């Protein structure tokens, strides 16, 4: 009995030790991604979401990262989505210190968007929205062969800013395969 308990404890210890080092892989729009180690997988809260993650801050707060893919020609294009994302803030777009940067990675166009302000958290179409001051947004729109993949992180501006490098590295790795 003692040997069985010892083996079980060792097995659990090894399993717990490896949880933090394994990277989860997932795909959206025919593009395979590897989850950054600082992100925690969550069950998507909507059938529209292809993947969903949390990024925990040291203060217990967290940011949310979501992936969407609707198929070729769907979801209104890059400019419409950038406008929609910036419109999710209380302030007008010209007061968000918003930046849009376009890159081409291995022949695929990627539009990155950043903004800081009061994010209006809530359902995308209607419903009650809750103002969340000092929020940040980092988004990536990948114009893939099977249609655009939309990645959006929102939450406390410090957490979102710190996640920018991980998001860009994840996108670059996915497109260089």
PLM feature segments, named:
Residues 1-10:
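Bacterial N-terminal signal peptides that target proteins for export
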Residues 9-17:
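Bacterial N-terminal signal peptides
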Residues 19-23:
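Sec/Tat signal peptide C-region and signal peptidase I cleavage site
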Residues 24-42:
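Short N-terminal segments immediately surrounding and downstream of signal-peptide cleavage
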Residues 37, 41, 45-50, 82-142:
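Signature of long, low-cysteine stretches enriched in small and polar/charged residues
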Residues 39, 145-177:
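Surface-exposed amphipathic alpha-helical segments
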Residues 52-84:
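A short acidic-to-branched-hydrophobic micro-motif
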Residues 58, 70-72, 116-120, 146, ...:
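Solvent-exposed coil/turn segments that connect beta secondary-structure elements
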């Amino acid at each position: 009995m003692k040997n069985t308990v010892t083996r079980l404890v060792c097995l659990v210890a090894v399993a717990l030790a490896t949880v933090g080092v394994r990277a989860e892989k997932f795909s959206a729009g025919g593009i395979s991604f590897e989850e950054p180690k600082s992100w925690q997988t969550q069950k998507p809260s909507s059938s529209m979401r292809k993947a969903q993650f949390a990024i925990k801050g040291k203060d217990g707060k967290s940011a949310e990262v979501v992936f969407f893919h609707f198929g070729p020609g769907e979801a209104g294009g890059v400019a419409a989505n950038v406008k929609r994302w910036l419109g999710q803030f209380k302030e007008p777009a010209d007061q968000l210190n918003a930046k849009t940067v376009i890159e081409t990675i291995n022949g695929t166009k990627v539009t990155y968007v950043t903004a800081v302000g009061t994010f209006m958290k809530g359902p995308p179409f209607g419903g009650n929205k809750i103002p969340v001051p000092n929020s940040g947004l980092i988004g990536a729109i990948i114009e893939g062969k099977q249609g655009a993949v939309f990645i959006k992180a929102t939450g406390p501006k410090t957490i979102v800013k710190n996640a920018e490098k991980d998001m860009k590295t994840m996108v670059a790795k996915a497109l260089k395969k």
